[in-house]
């Protein structure tokens, strides 16, 4: 369940030197059989993989909204491809905003593949007026919301070159901010 941000929470944030808000975009695609969590098939059947994807999206976006109750965070689903908003919406926590992250448009040289979508998501969140932005894997439904609040506060309290990374044991990252 999402907590409610109080005026006292916001006053605390201002006292800590936190200005603005941090966007956290869960990288998402609509959970459809044959299109989501395909590396799990087999042993899962495509419809089971899609249901698992839907549950992960709901739980991960709920975690972002819970973190928003204790830190200046706005939750997004950074989705692709364009035109799938209506398919994605029922699988998100209520109040989660959507932002297109399909990697279309001009990109700096060397930004390819999924990196295009990550950069597009970050650019889109900054375009919404946020002071800081993160992208978050949809594969972390049990990530404590406290870690998201800490990441947001760290980004908002630093200078323009502040970075937050959530490293995975496999060498990848679950959070980039």
Residue ranges of predicted features:
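A short, N-terminal amphipathic alpha-helix
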Residues: 53-72
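Short beta-strand/loop segment that forms part of the nucleotide-sugar
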Residues: 72-81
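Short, high-confidence coil segments that cap the C-terminus of an alpha-helix
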Residues: 72, 130, 159-161
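Short phosphate-binding loop-to-helix
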Residues: 87-132
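N-terminal nucleotide-binding beta1-loop-alpha1 segment
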Residues: 1-40
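Conserved donor-nucleotide/metal-binding helix-loop-beta segment in metal-dependent transferases, i.e.
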Residues: 141-170
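Short aromatic-hydrophobic micro-motifs that form the base-stacking/packing surface
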Residues: 134-136
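Short glycine-enriched loops at secondary-structure junctions
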Residues: 27-32, 80-84, 169-171
């Amino acid at each position: 369940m999402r907590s409610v941000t109080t005026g006292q929470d916001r006053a605390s944030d201002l006292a800590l030197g936190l200005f603005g808000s941090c966007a956290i975009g869960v990288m998402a695609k609509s959970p459809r059989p044959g299109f989501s969590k395909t590396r799990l098939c087999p042993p899962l059947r495509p419809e089971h993989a899609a249901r698992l994807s839907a549950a992960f999206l709901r739980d991960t976006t709920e975690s972002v909204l819970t973190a928003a109750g204790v830190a200046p965070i706005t939750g997004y689903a950074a989705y692709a491809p364009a035109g799938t908003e209506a398919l994605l919406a029922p699988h998100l926590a209520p109040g989660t905003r959507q932002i297109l992250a399909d990697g279309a448009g001009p990109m700096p040289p060397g930004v390819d593949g999924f990196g295009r979508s990550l950069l597009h998501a970050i650019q889109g969140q900054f375009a919404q007026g946020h002071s800081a932005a993160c992208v978050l894997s949809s594969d972390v439904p049990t990530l404590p919301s406290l870690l998201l609040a800490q990441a947001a506060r760290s980004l908002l309290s630093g200078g323009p070159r502040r970075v937050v990374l959530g490293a995975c044991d496999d060498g990848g990252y679950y959070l980039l901010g």
